Amino acid sequence: MENTIVQLSKYVITFLMICFTVQSFAALKERDEDERHYILMRQIIMIILMNFICFFVMFLQEGEVSTIQMFLLTMAYILGVQILYRLIYRKASMILLNNMCMLLSISMIILTRLSVSKAMSQYKILAASTLLCFIIPVIVRKGKFLKNLTWIYAVLGIAMLSVVMVLGFTSGGAKLSIEIHGITFQLSEIAKITLVFFMAGMLREDNSFGNVVKATVVAAVHVLILVASTDLGTAFVFFMAYVVVIYVATRKARYPLLGLAGMSAACVVAYFLFSHVRNRVALWQDPIGNWDISSQLAQGLFGMCSGGWFGTGLFEGRPDIIPVATKDFIFCAICEEMGIIFGICLILLCMSTFLLIINISMKMSKRFYKLIAMGLGTEYATQVFLTIGGTIKFIPMTGITLPLVSYGGSSMFSTVLMLSIIQGLYILREDEGEELEKRRNKKKRNQQKNDPGAKKKRRPDEETERRKKSGSRNDGQGTRQKYREQPDEFERRIEEQTENSLHW
């Protein structure tokens, strides 16, 4: 009986994931408020059903009380966040919130399957991060001072990376973090956010060549410190954020092209300088033949293949034998027991989140906020690409974790912080839209108030005849009046953008 339930559950889980992913993209393009509300409600029901089915199956398989505890804690978090956001931040993006809850649900499910202790540790970090970051949307919305701290962001980011380079301990061939009183901190996760804020502040008003050079020098210092720490995966994330922000700010293709050329040359140099980079390239070329170097990639590929399209079912596979399955290779563990179709939907869900962030960036009227959203979205997409691309042998492994899914406190905190900033930007854009809508309605009311009452009663043909007669006598005055009645082109465009934004 238990085996039948397990086998049926994997098809139901796959179906729920497919429906949630499709609904996520549908909500992005849906303009009707009521229909989008129904989509969001259906998504919440799917999240609850998926958690219930997965944790129920795991309890049937193991019979551990800790599984029930993790289910209750996960449900308390998801429902609590949904309720609090709707009470406090009514203008927040519920699409982004639902995507975050689904990704966190997948994380809690697979971590509970692999290690209940790590799942509990991850949950504590998640809860603390959410509480700490709950005020971030207010700071972004009201904090006009954020755009004036440009060089503080630069100094703070360089200082954090320098501390790790000097005092950090080596893991996987790279200096990634420092340890204080038994607690590990990966400061590069915070530095990638401060770098984006620095570049946005530097280029928010003046995107001249001089400011581009300043931004390039500071970004290069960040990247060079990471290279010296042999943390090349994070260095690539920083570099991609730099390239995209520079291009969006200047609209000049030569800057990213020069940057990509320099990065290509740096990759070649890194290959000859660092032995762990050569080992990862060798594993990428032949994971089976280089089993003596590491079995991570080969075990991950075996796990995904053994799961097939629908997976083996929870506790029916062996993802626990994959090295670092809770971190770098968590995507392989998910595909093994939940299926390749589930994994494809996970990729599409991450893509939906990225598109949503980019859409928010495009709707921002102020360049500072636009560049922040664009930079953070680029970092998120780059992390997803590096993690999944490395585990499926598309690119060499980089040691980057999957945001919101992989085990890791610093990564979890920085991602929750990043999404809280994005929510603040979305709320700010909604405020701007409402303000412009009020101005437009006020303008219409004033125009209606200033129109003579006789003009409303006059028939169209009489009005036309009257304008013809008056036009011949006072053509200049009529022309000036007509010019005054024409709306300003800039204001018309702003109103049009506001209307589209409100629909979106």
Model-derived features: positions:
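Hydrophobic transmembrane alpha-helical segments in integral membrane proteins
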Residues: 1-17
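Alpha-helical transmembrane segments
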Residues: 18-25, 81-83
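Membrane-interface helix-loop junction between the first two transmembrane segments
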Residues: 22-39
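Membrane-interface alpha-helices at helix entry/exit sites of multi-pass transporters
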Residues: 35-39, 188, 211, 316-317, ...
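Hydrophobic alpha-helical transmembrane segments of multi-pass inner membrane proteins, especially
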Residues: 63-293, 332, 336-390, 417, ...
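Short, Lys/Arg-enriched, Gly/Pro-containing loop segments at transmembrane-helix junctions
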Residues: 281, 429-440
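TM-adjacent membrane-interface loops and short helices in multi-pass inner/ER membrane proteins
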Residues: 287-331, 340-342
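Transmembrane alpha-helices of multi-pass inner-membrane enzymes
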Residues: 393-434
